[in-house]
Swiss-Prot record:
The lineage of its organism: Bacteria, Pseudomonadati, Campylobacterota, Epsilonproteobacteria, Campylobacterales. Signal peptide: none annotated. One of its GO terms (cellular component) is cytosol. Its main location: cytoplasm. InterPro entries: aa-tRNA-synt_IIb (IPR002314), aa-tRNA-synth_II (IPR006195), aa-tRNA-synth_II/BPL/LPL (IPR045864), Anticodon-bd (IPR004154), Anticodon-bd_dom_sf (IPR036621), Pro-tRNA-ligase_IIa (IPR002316), Pro-tRNA-synth_IIa_bac-type (IPR004500), Pro-tRNA-Synthase_IIa_type1 (IPR023717). Keywords: Aminoacyl-tRNA synthetase, ATP-binding, Cytoplasm, Ligase, Nucleotide-binding, Protein biosynthesis. It catalyses: tRNA(Pro) + L-proline + ATP = L-prolyl-tRNA(Pro) + AMP + diphosphate. One of its GO terms (biological process) is prolyl-tRNA aminoacylation. It comes from Helicobacter pylori (strain Shi470). Homodimer. This is Proline--tRNA ligase. HAMAP family: Pro_tRNA_synth_type1 (MF_01569). CDD domains: ProRS-INS (cd04334), ProRS_anticodon_short (cd00861), ProRS_core_prok (cd00779).
Amino acid sequence: MLFSKLFAPTLKEPPKDAVLKSHKHLAQAGYIYQVGSGIYNFLPLAKKVLDKIENITHKRMQEHGAQNILMSFVVLASLWEKSGRLDKYGKELLVFKDRKDNDFVLSPTLEENITEIAANFIKSYKQLPVHLYQIHTKFRDEIRPRFGLVRAREFIMKDGYSFHEDAESLDKEFLNTQSAYKEILSDLGLDFRIVEADSGAIGGSKSREFVVLTECGEDTIVVCKNCDYAANIEIAKRSKRPEPLNVPKAQLAKFPTPNTTSAQSVAEFFKTEPYFVLKALVRKVIHKDKETLACFFVRGDDNLEEVKALNALNLLGANALELREASKEDLNNAGLIAGFIGPYGLKKHVSYIIFDEDLKEGDCLIVGANEKDFHAVGVDLKGFENLVYADIVQVKESDHCPDCQGELKYHKSLEVGHIFKLGQGYAKSLKASFLDKNGKERFFEMGCYGIGISRLLSAILEQKSDDLGCVWTKNTAPFDVVIVVSNWKDEAQKKLAFEVYERLRQKGVDALLDDRDARFGAKMRDFELIGERLALIVGKQTLESKEFECIKRANLEKQTLKDTELEEKILEMLKSE
């Protein structure tokens, strides 16, 4: 490829609204062009990288038995209504009408579509298991699209779905796909982790995320310093904590506690640890057609994990869509006083009450008395009947691992893949069944598997690039080598550059010849910005010495290559990371 023919409209400066280096580099180097909020055009350089990512993905998925299909981007809204997700998914789901007043959605995910296909064409256990996948455009109407391709509204995704006759078969395919994803991300040269995760709006009994470790990441994962335990903070667990020595032993009594509305101030008032203070967190629960209140109790030195809290509510059958912090008006209307909320008589004020599981058999507690400026001491939760316990706290750094007791630490991460065990939920709601070996009708067990293809461009750059521009991994760079001519007006340099260009191409090297009549410094700046893996310099000294200067983009390390061994050395360098 000649640079003069390459459509790569580089910019002098990155966009002013670009925050992440991946967004800055992709826009400035001419990889992407923004159409609107969270919507991007992929220009030739980006398309080359995307093609490489997609080819690796196709190769590994098909090696693991998955079959490639292509489904409609536009889906009937009635399918989403049948599955119950039309309302649950919220405003991120873009719904529109055609000229005949039929409702459709732009798919952010395709469980409904693929389940309908299975329902129509898979009739017998003999056709199972089957794993179908696609790489296609998706749309999610993000309220605040940001960070370039990291949080876009329109994006490219590899999504796959598997159908099984029983849970055992699903378990095998779940692990099979996990292996495929590990191979894909390893081929892409990424440093990644597999973590336990919440299933969110997709649903299902179990899910795992594939995350890239990067400080720009929107997610926090919790990892053990001693073992392989890793989980998204939304579902991370910890071992049971030891009780502090300073136990506030007291008979049950009510004490005046003026202006002590926080767990810390209550602990200081009674000269004890926040561990023994019962912290009440009231949330407004948003249902499909109503709003209620829920109160969550945790120890005073803990914080509520909102995702765990929502999941705990739904295990009670609440069918909650989301949680919002209760306002002062909400509390007043319910007859509650912020800072003094406790379990006594609380059932008449809220619809749901959940205690963190760390409070099981909790005693010597200090709790709000549901009366302004009063707390109760010496409270033993064993004296209450039918309390509901669940894991609802957010794990803290320095908490201990549930597997080995090692210390837990936080890491910022960016999700690039997610796999789910969906079970029979979608099959039941969409009436997707088959006949088993006994001729009995049964619902499919389903799995769901996704990789953010376009997001991977940003993930690679966030992990590998520097302040100068793009640094791609071995299998993702748009070109292997760029040949940079020091003085394009020198016919001898130009002639040698074309000769080298042809020699490398004959060896299968994807080379770019910078044939522009531009300053040498400007050409090198574009090399640093675009991120070809190697730059091969052709200059006056090359003509005299028959030696080339070669620069690795990853670390800007320079090497001198003799003309007689040029192709051999270039191929060696390209094979290395």
